Amino acid sequence: MVEKVRNIVVEELVRTPVEMQEVELVERKGIGHPDSIADGIAEAVSRALSREYLKRYGIILHHNTDQVEVVGGRAYPQFGGGEVIKPIYILLSGRAVELVDREEFPVHQVAIKAAKDYLKKAVRHLDIENHVVIDSRIGQGSVDLVGVFNKAKENPIPLANDTSFGVGYAPLSETERIVLETEKLLNSEEFKKKCPAVGEDIKVMGLRKGDEIDLTIAAAIVDSEVSNPDDYMAVKEEIYEAAKGVVEEHTQRPTKIFVNTADDPKNGIYYITVTGTSAEAGDDGSVGRGNRVNGLITPNRHMSMEAAAGKNPVSHVGKIYNLLSMLIANDIAEQVEGVQEVYVRILSQIGKPIDEPLVASIQIIPKKGYSIDVLQKPAYEIADAWLADVTKIQKMILDDKLNVF
């Protein structure tokens, strides 16, 4: 067997590392944010379709469900419990094979069930039957199964269905880690048991100026869990203390923590919701407007604008290459001594095998005292090994070992 020679380029990146830049901005939209709801549903639908295709036909058929829109409803929250006046409308769109050798595949049933199951898990106080309307308008496609199997035999490595690129980097900065871990803690099962009044719509914004960090948290509070303003303020204090614990674990930099800064108690303004998400009150959401595949929005870093959620896990490089870039970057940062920062960009060419990108660009900022010459070979080998086993990404996705937002 002839070994493939892949177009992997490893070079030194000459720029100021993020930790040494004067200003750093980092954002994470929590799982109950309308944009994250759209991402989560799109991905849940794709995974459900993939598993059902595999179960029935032994192969994942073509689909992309990365067009989900969340249209905000209207609610009347009040201490002790309010009500949703107009339900949130969720539109499922995209494409999926619905006709297989003249046999109909239940695309819409699978998609709607996946969306409902995801929402039940992601937004605890949302009444799926009364607070939400889910409409599936996923477009149809048909397929000749024999032809699909024959094509898969001819091309065991899937062919890229687009000319696109993915981007990843490592390691996370202190500010990035704090923002990510703060939201994860506040939306963890453990914290919800301790403080059930905190909804899932949590947005965390980190600003580092020099050596000082400002952490701003917007957290929707569930009105049925707080009887009065005093209860509400006690919940805010719980959020503050939880965030403080995360900060102390990850940095010694002086950090200020702000929670729900739009509150105006004198005028009776508090961030309370019926469901725990601002989608109940007119906030809309779309796939791809939120976190990148590492869970963050990072304007100090290279980023791809591609929406990974909902894209098929077989051949859509908009999903696969973003995840792959992140995994390669993580491994290089962890396994290669002397790497301060690493950035990975992988570009596909439509119709070409996904293990043979047009280029896999690896840019490294070496630590002081290290030369790029000693870092190139191990970085190359890590990237090459991942590309050789790129179809592993598909299994990792379906085994729920990878998140895309």
UniProtKB/Swiss-Prot annotation:
Pfam families: AdoMet_Synthase (PF01941). One of its GO terms (biological process) is one-carbon metabolic process. It is an enzyme of class 2 (transferase). Keywords: ATP-binding, Magnesium, Nucleotide-binding, One-carbon metabolism, Transferase. Catalyzes the formation of S-adenosylmethionine from methionine and ATP. HAMAP family: S_AdoMet_synth2. This is S-adenosylmethionine synthase. It comes from Thermococcus gammatolerans (strain DSM 15229 / JCM 11827 / EJ3).
